[in-house]
Amino acid sequence: MENKIAPFSYSGSSAGNSSSGGVVSSSLYSDQLYKSTRNIMQQRQDMVNREALCYTRLHEASLEAEALRLENTELRSMNLRLKNELNSLIRSSIQNRFDHRSPLRMLSNLSIGGNDADEVENQNRTVNRDDVNDKSPTSVMENEDLNRSSLPKSISVRSNGYSKASQGGGGAAAQSGKPRGTVTKPGTCGQVSTTQKVYVRGGGKKEDQEEEIEVEVYNQGMTKTELCNKWQETGTCPYGDHCQFAHGIKELRPVIRHPRYKTEVCRMVLAGDNCPYGHRCHFRHSLSEQEKLVAAGFKPKSSLKLIT
């Protein structure tokens, strides 16, 4: 009978051990499940935090973009306002420039030595000097605020009397028999300084409204017939009143010129070279559109180099 009980007790002991092992396995599984669940929740919380941070940064970026947009709009409006002010300033400056030059309208038919213009020849008539007074035509120019850099180097008057003045060395003065102030200027190659009177057309727009203006003209090279370079550059001259050149438009005397003065283009300029005579050249330096095409057809002169 003992042999039958012993196996029973052994089997019972085995059953107890099996039950104990099952409890241990269940607790381990619960711990692992808890840890994995906790890790998953931690990862989810991290994702939520990162998403919130992204939303925060996106909101800040949108606010910064809006601020930049407002600043850009303000800069555009400021730029437009400055542009309008600049345009108004330019218009007023141009208007003032035209207003300052209004006293010079009487010389619209004259050829300005510093500015080459393709104008129609003036049909001027020479008259006897005894029938007119000695008042200079430049006395009507009352404006002293002109920019020195924009003043002409000389005032040229085309006249048929130029040929008469060049013949006989006296022109109208020799014909009238009363030479006036024939003074030889030093450094002008002994040129005789004579004056005569000519008529030029005024600045009227219509031919019937044009009034002839009496102008006293001088020969080239006489005193005060060209603007002083030193005065034009700095506004002062070391020679002062003893300077032989003009210090302003009021002192500038008109110079009588040949009727074809400044009517033909300078060949050196047309060939693309620099004219050594500058504003003293008797030919035009400004080119028309057709002359520019002709000048473009000239091939530039290649400099010849001597090879030794």
Swiss-Prot record:
The residue stretches assigned to a coiled coil in this entry are 56-91
Give the chief site where it resides: cytoplasm
Q: Quote the subcellular location field of this record.
A: Cytoplasm; Nucleus
**Which Gene Ontology CC terms are recorded?**
cytoplasm; nucleus
| Polar residues biased stretches | 148-164
Q: Which InterPro entries match?
A: ZFP36-like, Znf_CCCH, Znf_CCCH_sf
Q: In which tissues is it expressed?
A: Highly expressed in secondary cell wall-forming tissues and the xylem cells of roots. Expressed predominantly in inflorescence stems, flowers and siliques. Highly expressed in the basal portion of stems, where cells are undergoing secondary cell wall thickening. Highly expressed in meiocytes and tapetum from anthers.
Phenotype of the disruptant?
No visible phenotype under normal growth conditions. The double mutants c3h14 and c3h15 have reductions in stem secondary cell wall thickening and defects in anther development. Callose deposition defects in microspores, and pollen exine formation severely affected, leading to male sterility.
Instruction: Cite the PROSITE patterns for this sequence.
Output: ZF_C3H1
Q: How is it modified after translation?
A: Phosphorylated at Ser-111 by ASK7/BIN2 in the cytoplasm in the absence of brassinosteroids (BRs).
Which Gene Ontology MF annotations are present? Answer: DNA-binding transcription factor activity; mRNA binding; transcription cis-regulatory region binding; zinc ion binding
Q: Keyword annotations for this protein?
A: Brassinosteroid signaling pathway, Coiled coil, Cytoplasm, DNA-binding, Metal-binding, Nucleus, Phosphoprotein, Repeat, Transcription, Transcription regulation, Zinc, Zinc-finger
One of its GO biological process terms is: brassinosteroid mediated signaling pathway
Q: Which residues carry this modification: Phosphoserine?
A: 111
Matches recorded under SMART domains: ZnF_C3H1 (SM00356)
Describe, by residue range, where the zinc fingers (C3H1-type) fall in the chain: 222-250, 260-288
Composition-biased stretches, type Low complexity, lie in 9-21
Per the record, which residues fall in region Disordered?
Answer: 1-21, 110-190
Instruction: State the protein's purpose.
Output: Functions probably as a transcriptional factor that activates genes involved in secondary cell wall biosynthesis. Functions redudantly with C3H14 to regulate secondary cell wall formation. C3H14 and C3H15 have overlapping roles in the regulation of secondary cell wall formation and anther development. C3H14 may contribute more to secondary cell wall thickening while C3H15 could be more important in anther development.
Miscellaneous comment text of the record:
Plants overexpressing C3H15 exhibit small and slightly curled leaves, and retarded stem elongations due to cell elongation defect and ectopic secondary cell wall formation. Overexpression of C3H15 results in secondary cell wall thickening in fibers and vessels.
Stated name of the protein:
Zinc finger CCCH domain-containing protein 15
